[in-house]
């Protein structure tokens, strides 16, 4: 759960990031979601310019992120003894947190169902057509092959890497999404206490780096990579990807 220091001040994203972070404690209680406000650190190494952290601090302060500050190595190592020798300072966001994304997604779905939302699973959208002030959505059930048509005043396109397909059915502004695959390494619970905060790397010309974080279940999560791929369903992991994670993570821990 991001603190909100990276979003551009004045944008809707910045407003909702900080507001959403604030609401997480209540949401976790209401929906019984595993949630821990463990705080996050954006670490800066010897070969990086500290001004990058200062810019994030300025953005976070403008966005209203509470208790945001830069801490020096002595205090930092007291908080996280296993940080790399190259780490010199870090931006500390106490409001950062972690959840289980699977539990969270299911909790949202269960709550929606309780509130009357109907789910049409295994249902493929074939076409979306503008019909006056509404939309006509033609679907095919992938198991029974039954066809069904829906009318809707509003269609929310939440199709991920396939969002361009549905956008292009109705919009003159055609889109093409190039999928970007991220590989993670989930370590055993024996490694779960290696760090207690979510450790981000300061973005550089070489990319955003990888994070190292505990999970709410006690594991350690490292990642992701970021590789453009042609196959939108390429969810396989690779030896080269995992090697890259290990090498990049070593910059911070």
Protein language model regions, located:
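Active-site substrate-recognition segment that forms the wall
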Residues: 1, 22, 26, 31-37, ...
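Dinucleotide-binding Rossmann-like beta1-alpha1 core, especially the glycine-rich loop
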Residues: 2-79, 88, 209-210
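Short beta-strand to alpha-helix junction loop
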Residues: 12-18, 43-52, 91-113, 120, ...
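A short, glycine/Asx- and small/polar-enriched loop/turn
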Residues: 48-51, 79-87, 129-136, 192
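General beta-strand structural signal in soluble alpha/beta enzymes
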Residues: 69-72, 119-121, 157, 222
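Helical element adjacent to the flavin cofactor pocket in flavoenzyme catalytic cores
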Residues: 91-154
């Amino acid at each position: 759960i991001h603190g909100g220091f990276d979003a551009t001040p004045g944008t809707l994203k910045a407003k909702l990031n900080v507001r959403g972070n604030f609401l997480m404690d209540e949401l976790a209680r209401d929906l019984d979601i595993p949630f821990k406000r463990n705080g996050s650190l954006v670490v800066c190494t010897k070969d990086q310019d500290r001004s990058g952290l200062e810019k994030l601090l300025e953005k976070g302060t403008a966005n209203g992120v509470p208790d945001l500050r830069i801490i020096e190595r002595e205090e930092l190592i007291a908080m996280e003894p296993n940080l790399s020798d190259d780490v010199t300072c870090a931006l500390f966001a106490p409001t950062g947190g972690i959840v289980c994304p699977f539990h969270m997604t299911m909790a949202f779905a269960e709550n929606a169902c309780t509130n009357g939302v109907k789910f049409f699973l295994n249902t493929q959208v074939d076409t979306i057509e503008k019909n006056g002030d509404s939309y006509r959505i033609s679907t095919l059930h992938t198991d029974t092959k039954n066809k069904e048509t829906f009318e809707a005043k509003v269609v929310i396109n939440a199709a991920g890497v396939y969002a361009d397909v549905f956008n292009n059915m109705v919009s003159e502004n055609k889109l093409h999404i190039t999928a970007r695959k991220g590989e993670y390494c989930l370590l055993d619970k024996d490694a779960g206490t290696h760090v207690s905060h979510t450790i981000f790397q300061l973005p550089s010309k070489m990319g955003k780096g990888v994070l190292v974080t505990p999970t709410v279940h006690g594991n350690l999560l490292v990642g992701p990579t970021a590789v453009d791929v042609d196959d939108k369903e390429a969810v396989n992991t690779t030896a080269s990807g995992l090697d890259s994670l290990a090498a990049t993570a070593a910059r911070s821990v």
